[in-house]
Amino acid sequence: MKTEKKVLDELSLHASAKMGARDVESSMNADSTPVLASVAVSMELLPTASVLYSDVAGCFKYSAKHHC
């Protein structure tokens, strides 16, 4: 869980830089994992973020449309 939290925090920082902190907070209040995954893909963040996330989730396929 610590690794997943670390990745989510990293995605939040990237998303915050793109969207602004208020939008990220709104995303975190919802079901944060798929929301941030969608943000990571839709905002075209660094591919490494998706790779890191795949290691944690085990089912993330670089596209938020592929859910377990």
UniProtKB/Swiss-Prot annotation:
2,3-didehydrobutyrine carried by residues: 33
Proregion residues excised on maturation: 1-31
UniProt keyword Repeat, yes or no: no
Signal peptide annotation: none
Top-level taxon: Bacteria
GO molecular function: signaling receptor binding
BP terms from Gene Ontology: defense response to bacterium; killing of cells of another organism
Modifications after synthesis and translation: It is not established whether the 2,3-didehydrobutyrine is the E- or Z-isomer.
Sequence positions bearing D-alanine (Ser): 38, 42, 50
Keyword set includes Zinc-finger: no
Keywords: Antibiotic, Antimicrobial, Bacteriocin, D-amino acid, Lantibiotic, Plasmid, Pyruvate, Thioether bond
Residue numbers carrying Pyruvic acid (Ser): 32
Purpose: Inhibits the growth of selected species of the genera Lactobacillus, Pedicoccus, and Leuconostoc.
Name of the protein: Bacteriocin lactocin-S
Organism per entry: Latilactobacillus sakei L45
Phylogenetic placement of the source organism: Bacteria, Bacillati, Bacillota, Bacilli, Lactobacillales
